[in-house]
């Protein structure tokens, strides 16, 4: 379920990376892989066969089922439609069909739990908590419901009830993923027990307060984030639906909570986790990290399944960062076929060694730079919007450039070659 995105802090290999790794805070994969719940006596497979035509939900078929006056069966049909749309990355329609299912069968815990998962995935955390609590009231001893309740609480920044829900879930059913999420939440709660929390509408900032220098740094962090929030809203045409959580750690606290590799310099798992060590005032490097990590939060709000190279490329553009320092190294690797094609950089970089990771992130930045130079920020924005409709990455790329990955690889190489002349 995790993906790894990094920011090249300076130069080429041997530098520190900033990571983006969805944990319990982002449940797209969990929603996609969750087994279909039983809704009354409905046969979901049979309903799905009725409502899907040419790989699309047929609204007239749903209307026909609804006209038969059987609310629970109709709710099951809308639930089946929601799962189908979510599997095809059409998230807005998945939410819409889920809402209709709940209107028809409000006492079905499975429908509340499923809707809560979708709301977490779309960043609507307070609403997700409300739906998950409804599910838990109806079926308090369901391990799956308690798991989702924990996810909702965790994302809403409510660690104690999240821990309680996950413990309850594990008492009902052993689950390795829930155990992992619980352990992470307990580490986080232990480290942050004396943290101060401050909000400004757009951000919830948690930090170890109590010193004047930390208050000054807090104000600098808010100013930097607020400026970049406006920039990203303009550049990407959208913004997260709720406050973004930002947690400032010491170096040791950061690694205690995240258990990240030693080369990781910051992390976004739905919460921006920033280790500032002994920093007491804003530096250019810290500003770049904050801008980078906030970009990941914006991209995830638009399209949870963004190809990793695009996600990382955009984040580096927004720092802002240039590839000039290492473009010749990348060009040599491309010419000697020591660099992977971009189609192989859609998923997690977590299994790469440090040198491979730096190369992958450099390629991501170069691809984004080329697309911006050829199609403008509008082209990158249109690609995100195409992905948000459920398009596959290569189809979204074609919708902007007219070509697929093979053409993009060639164009990036030509872009680098022309730069070297």
Residues covered by each model-derived region:
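Canonical positions in the second alpha-helix
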Residues: 65-68, 100-101, 134-135, 168-169
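Juxtacatalytic substrate-recognition/specificity segment
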Residues: 194-307, 318-325, 333-339, 346-350, ...
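Active-site-proximal alpha-helical
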Residues: 232, 339-406, 417
């Amino acid at each position: 379920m995790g993906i790894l995105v990094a920011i090249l802090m300076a130069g080429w290999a041997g530098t520190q990376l900033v990571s983006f790794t969805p944990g319990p805070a982002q449940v797209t994969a969990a929603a996609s892989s969750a087994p279909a719940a039983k809704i009354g006596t409905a046969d979901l497979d049979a309903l799905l066969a009725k409502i899907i035509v040419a790989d699309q939900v047929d609204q007239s078929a749903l209307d026909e089922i609804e006209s038969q006056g059987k609310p629970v069966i109709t709710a099951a049909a809308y639930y089946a439609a929601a799962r189908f749309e979510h599997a095809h990355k059409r998230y807005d329609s998945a939410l819409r069909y889920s809402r209709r299912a709940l209107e028809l069968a409000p006492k079905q815990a499975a429908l509340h739990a499923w809707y809560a998962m979708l709301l977490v995935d779309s960043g609507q955390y307070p609403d997700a908590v409300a739906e998950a609590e409804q599910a838990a009231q109806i079926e308090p001893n369901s391990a799956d419901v308690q798991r989702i309740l924990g996810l909702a609480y965790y994302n809403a920044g409510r660690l104690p009830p999240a821990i309680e829900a996950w413990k309850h879930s594990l008492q009902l059913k052993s689950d390795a993923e829930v155990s992992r999420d619980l352990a992470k939440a307990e580490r986080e709660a232990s480290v942050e027990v004396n943290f101060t929390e401050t909000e400004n509408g757009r951000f919830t900032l948690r930090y170890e307060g109590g010193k004047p220098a930390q208050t000054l740094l807090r104000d600098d962090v808010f100013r930097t984030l607020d400026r970049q929030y406006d920039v990203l809203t303009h550049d990407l045409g959208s913004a997260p639906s709720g406050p973004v959580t930002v947690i400032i750690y010491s170096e040791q606290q950061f690694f205690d909570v995240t258990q990240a590799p030693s080369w990781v310099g910051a992390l976004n798992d739905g919460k921006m986790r920033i280790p500032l060590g002994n920093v007491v005032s804003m530096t250019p490097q810290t500003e770049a990290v904050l801008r980078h990590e906030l970009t990941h939060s914006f991209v995830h709000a638009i399209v949870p399944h963004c190809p990793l190279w695009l996600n990382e490329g955009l984040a580096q553009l927004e720092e802002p960062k240039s590839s000039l320092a290492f473009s010749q190294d990348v060009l040599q690797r491309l010419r000697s076929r020591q660099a992977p094609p971009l189609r192989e950089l859609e998923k997690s970089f977590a299994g790469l060694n440090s040198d491979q990771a730096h190369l992958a992130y450099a390629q991501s930045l170069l691809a984004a730079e080329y697309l911006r130079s050829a199609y403008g920020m509008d082209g990158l924005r249109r690609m995100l919007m195409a992905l948000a409709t459920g398009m596959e990455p290569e189809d979204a790329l074609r919708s902007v450039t007219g070509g697929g990955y093979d053409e993009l690889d060639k164009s990036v190489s030509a872009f680098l070659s022309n730069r070297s002349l």
